[in-house]
Swiss-Prot record:
It comes from Clostridium perfringens (strain SM101 / Type A). It catalyses: tRNA(Asn) + L-asparagine + ATP = L-asparaginyl-tRNA(Asn) + AMP + diphosphate + H(+). HAMAP family: Asn_tRNA_synth. Its main location: cytoplasm. The lineage of its organism: Bacteria, Bacillati, Bacillota, Clostridia, Eubacteriales. It is found in: Cytoplasm. This is Asparagine--tRNA ligase.
């Protein structure tokens, strides 16, 4: 009886353990007891559902102690697994011995009642023990594995790009500065500014906003690569969709144009969603019942739809001709807002859709300029219920065009010398995209706030835990 059985194994292979003695270890979720017998729901973290343990005063020598245990106390239970086909739970464990591993204080905040997500954010160190967050973070784990599996199975090389960087991939300047200088008395340059040449790295350094530029270096050596790591944006955006620290998946593919880029993005999205649905049916059922009642239908729709395609110019025309009054008026040259994206995917196409060929003035410098000189070979993948979930492009491989674009945006070539040099040594057509991992988890779970799909959220004014 030394071997502890995981609760997940009991649920997945119930018949194998039926009428046999098993040992489980976990935490008490609920406990109710009379003078003669009691019931404990135990969760060991391996599975979404709890196990019901029945304990009898005639069999359990420490019955009185067990019957008064507070919620969240940790215990080990030895007993016989008995199938209960006529009950809500498929089986129960009839206890023969219960060992107290660790007591919980009676002021444990997660008692058996409904708690708001706002309250649970204040106890982020404990919220993984709640049903909603147990489900969320298990889905997050499985989705992360599915992403790696999708790319590894197709021969992509997993590449670690730096978190500390001296360049701004997006050219937006919304970056967190990293320094070891004394901010009370920083060294001053001849021009009167801070002298970053005396800093740790000898230059101004920041937390990365994207690994894409570094990833392109590896794509032009390994052909197909992907990154999956943390990124940081110093955007003062206190919204349900923005966080200062989040995770990004960024594949880059050599010898691939925008059409290839969209094909990989569509296949990846479908694969990951289906993988999570197959591996986490209990969690998805929970979200569908308690968080987003249309979730299952929407996920199945995405998995089984052929994604639509429309150019930005066509999309603007469709929106203008729809007769719908938008909060933000639609005109050519604006960046599409969430309301526009959702209308396209929910009302016009009624399925996921790629919007391509955006105006160059609202997109990044590295995107390939189209023949019209006004648009770039960019794509955004829009999905029902959320809008944009993926953004990507064919990269500008022509050195002269790339330099001209950087000059337009007043970007310093010296900061990107190594990126420009890629265009000198065997450049080729190449493409890639970025997927915000938290936004994907929000979509798969139906959770409405990015703060609730990342373990310890970092947002404007918040860096607790």
């Amino acid at each position: 009886m030394k071997d502890v059985v995981l609760v997940k194994s009991l649920y997945r292979n119930t018949s194998e353990y039926s009428d046999k003695k098993v040992k489980i270890s976990g935490w008490i979720r609920t406990l109710r007891a009379s003078n003669a017998f009691g019931f404990i729901e135990v969760n060991d973290g391996s599975f979404f559902k709890n196990v019901q343990v029945v304990f009898d005063s005639a069999k359990i020598s420490n019955y009185k102690e067990i019957s008064k245990l507070p919620i969240s106390s940790s215990i080990s239970v030895i007993g016989t697994l008995v199938e209960t086909p006529d009950s809500k739970q498929p089986f129960e464990i009839q206890a023969e011995e219960i060992i107290v591993e660790g007591m919980s204080d009676s002021d444990y905040p997660l008692q058996k009642k409904r708690h708001t997500f706002e309250y649970l954010r204040t106890i982020a160190h404990l919220r993984p023990r709640s049903n909603a967050f147990s489900a969320t973070f298990r889905v997050r784990s499985v989705a992360a594995y599915a992403i790696h599996k999708f790319f590894q199975d197709q021969g992509f090389v997993y590449t670690h790009t730096p978190i500390l960087t001296g360049s701004d991939c997006e050219g937006a300047g919304e970056m967190f500065r990293v320094t070891t200088l004394d901010m009370m008395a920083p060294p001053i340059s001849e021009e009167g500014g801070i002298d970053f040449s005396q800093d740790f790295f000898g230059k101004e350094t920041n937390l990365t906003v994207s690994g894409q530029l570094n990833a392109e270096c590896f794509a032009l050596a390994f052909r197909n690569i992907y990154t999956f790591g943390p990124t940081f944006r110093a955007e003062n955006s206190n919204t349900v969709k923005h966080a200062a620290e989040f995770w990004m998946i960024e594949p880059e593919m050599a010898f691939a144009d925008l059409i290839d880029d969209m094909e990989v993005a569509e296949n990846m999205l479908k694969y990951v969603i289906k993988y999570v649905m197959d591996e986490c049916p209990e969690e998805i059922a929970f979200f569908n019942q308690f968080v987003d009642k249309g979730l299952l239908e929407r996920l199945n729709h995405v998995v089984n739809s052929e994604f639509g395609k429309v150019t930005y110019t066509e999309a603007v025309k469709l929106l203008q001709e729809s007769g719908k009054e938008f909060e933000y008026p639609v005109e050519w040259g604006i960046d599409l807002q969430t309301e526009h994206e959702r209308y396209l995917t929910e009302q016009i196409f009624k399925k996921p859709v790629f919007v391509t060929d955006y105006p160059k003035d609202i997109k990044a410098f590295y995107m390939r300029l189209n023949e019209d000189g006004k648009t770039v070979a960019a794509m955004d993948c829009l999905v029902p219920g959320i809008g944009e979930i993926i953004g990507g492009s064919q990269r500008e491989e022509r050195l002269d065009v790339l330099k001209a674009r950087m000059a337009e945006l007043n970007l310093n070539e010296e900061d990107y010398w190594w990126y420009l040099e890629l265009r000198k040594y065997g450049e080729t057509v190449h493409s890639g995209f970025g997927l915000g991992f938290e936004r994907l988890i929000m979509y798969i779970t139906g959770m409405a706030n990015i703060r609730d799909v990342i373990p310890f959220p970092r947002t404007t004014g918040t860096a607790e835990f």
